Amino acid sequence: MQAKSELALCCTCLLILFLAQPLAGQAQPAALSAAEATLKKPTDFRSRAEVRNEYQNLEGDGYRDIVTPRFEYAVKPSVAVRLELPYMTYDPGGGGERVSGQGDLLARGAWRAIQREGFALIVATDVIFDTADDDRLGFGKTIVAPHMYAAIDLPGYDSVFFPNIQHYVSVAGDRTRGDVNFTTLKPNLLTRWPNKIYTFLEPQFSIDWERDAKTGLTIELEVGKILSRNIAAWVRPGIGAINKYELPFVYEWNLEVGMRYIF
């Protein structure tokens, strides 16, 4: 399958970059680079541009392949705005029609409301606009999704715990499409490792209020590395653990690769 081949090529390129980095010079600059500063203080917003490619394996032989460019502008360390617009390919499997095109545009505003030693609280709102080229590539609705998460330092483990809650609700759009009303809960964990490597564990519980509060669970583990002063890359596999064939946002398994430039 072409999408799988392209993703395998991306993974191979990233693996080569990961392995090549330890061969660089041993001298380290006194000041943290932009990428290192972001890893050290993840709640200090910095402007960044990134692109990621996610392959989701669905029931049967169906799949989604999603390429998402994202730009985030830090107005100041406590305020940021974000835009992202995915390009998607969806194949339902079973001989169904494959479709490709633009997905829904997402815009976010985020504010770090509290910053104390070892603790921060961020509040944000996403607005997802109905811009998809095809009904199968988007929600068919305009969605508002308020969002809040904390950042709790765990210095004994060189980690940060990010308890995270977000609620998605449709406010406008195609009346023939189903309403959107679900909540996600994510007890995320960032851990820093030697050689500028990090991991980010993201279990996501999704509660769909339109389906009698049916709950799904996906678990993803991102393994990333700082490649230069401004560039980081990552690989993120994931699995669907609960209700993977009964909720639209719970896949069978997925694999994501990405690269980020931090200004």
Regions found by a protein language model. Give the residues of each.
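Cleavable N-terminal export/targeting peptides
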Residues: 1-36
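Transmembrane beta-barrel domains of Gram-negative outer membranes and organellar outer membranes
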Residues: 26-263
